């Protein structure tokens, strides 16, 4: 048997890891506080009872917070080659997460506060978000969006109804960046939980593996 098992992160982690990757690369991260407002489609079908979610917020999603608190560090960590084994050394910043379910069909919204290792200005953080180009762009993957992320300057954006389907649901939207009186900065991250966070991530992984020559043609005759 030839192949590999590729695991995707939690769909909420996708919307968190993207802006954290930029901040870690540019300024370094010390601490992160995140509260998620997760769409009901993330619970699958039939999902959450209409009587439970209609006009309500459910402040608990089983096993969700522990995933969000550990996965970003692992994703942004580094690979270390040992004898006959490759291990992951997670990044050292701390993540504190609260995950909630809200009456929205599609689109996870995250309220994120960060403490950076190096002091910087609001303008430089905006510039880092606006100018970021992922290294995977060189592969020109078929399912990848033209814009990996976009930064919105309107006070009331991003919103699931207006922004979750941006570029067929594959673009992550950031906005409401402002100083945080407790940490350094706070902002909103929004992405489509099933298109960018779950199914789309799986397809991108397969396309990436093919582009990197990791998939072999199999003759099943």
Per-segment meaning from a language model:
Residues 4-15, 63-66, 197-203:
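A glycine-rich, Thr/Ser-enriched phosphate-binding loop motif common to dinucleotide/cofactor-binding enzymes
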Residues 10, 116, 189:
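Conserved residues at beta->alpha junctions
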Residues 22, 128-131, 203-207:
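Short, solvent-exposed amphipathic alpha-helical segments in soluble enzyme
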């Amino acid at each position: 048997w030839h192949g590999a098992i590729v695991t995707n992160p939690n769909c909420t982690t996708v919307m968190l890891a993207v802006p954290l990757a930029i901040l870690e690369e540019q300024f370094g991260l010390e601490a992160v506080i995140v509260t998620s407002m997760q769409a009901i489609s993330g619970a699958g079908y039939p999902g959450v009872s209409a009587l439970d979610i209609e006009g309500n917020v459910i402040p608990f999603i089983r096993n969700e917070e522990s995933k969000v608190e550990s996965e970003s560090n692992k994703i942004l960590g580094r690979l270390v080659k040992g004898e006959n084994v490759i291990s992951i050394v997670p990044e050292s910043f701390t993540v504190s997460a609260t995950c909630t379910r809200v009456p929205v069909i599609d689109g996870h919204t995250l309220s994120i506060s960060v403490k950076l290792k190096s002091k910087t200005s609001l303008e430089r953080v905006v510039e880092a978000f606006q100018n970021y180009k992922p290294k995977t762009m060189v592969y020109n993957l078929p399912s990848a969006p033209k814009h990996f992320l976009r930064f919105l300057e309107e006070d009331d954006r991003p919103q699931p109804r207006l922004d979750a389907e941006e570029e067929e649901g594959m673009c992550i939207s950031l906005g409401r960046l402002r100083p945080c009186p407790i940490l350094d900065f706070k902002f909103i991250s929004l992405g489509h939980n099933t298109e960018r966070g779950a199914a789309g991530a799986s397809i991108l992984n397969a396309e990436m593996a093919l582009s990197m020559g990791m998939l072999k043609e199999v003759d099943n005759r």
